[in-house]
Amino acid sequence: RILQSVKHCNISVLYIKTDQQLLAQTQKLQQRATFHILQEYARSGVFEQIILVDNTSVSEMIGELSIADYYESLNQTIVPMINFINVFNNSKPGMSTFGPFADVSRIRTLGMVNVETGEEKLIFPRDNRNETRYYYAINAKSLKEDGTLHNKIRKQMKGKNEKSSFGIFETSYDKNFCYSVVCSREIVQL
């Protein structure tokens, strides 16, 4: 009944997968059921998208973390990614190859991309992708003075097995950075 009453709304779900080793058997079964059911709802269009996050993957991306600051550090990595992607989705890029996401591409995760090397680290491991969107946040100085930037980004887009698009957004930050949204139509199995 609840899902029927919100069917007309665009709902995005952020699913944070806890480390399986920290869960009791009943909790593992609950996580598995919830995880799969929410993905099926996203695939069927009940949800606009489900963004998958794996605390273990985020922890590995960050590096060594103290126990006292563990969850705070994870949150300080995840929240800015989501915030910047939301800001960029509502901003005009300086250059863009973005088109609409495919209707079937509702199971998603996020990544951080090294602007110089193109190395990508995802916050949830994904083998199967059908499209990826890259959000390059580039400072004004680099946009004006770096003659290699455009070719570097184009080169990073080549060789991708999935449909890839990018947007370049001007920022006032000293460092350039890039986030990715990785989409799939396939359910992730636990």
Name every feature range the model reports, one short phrase each.
Residues 1-190:
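Tubulin/FtsZ superfamily GTPase core signature
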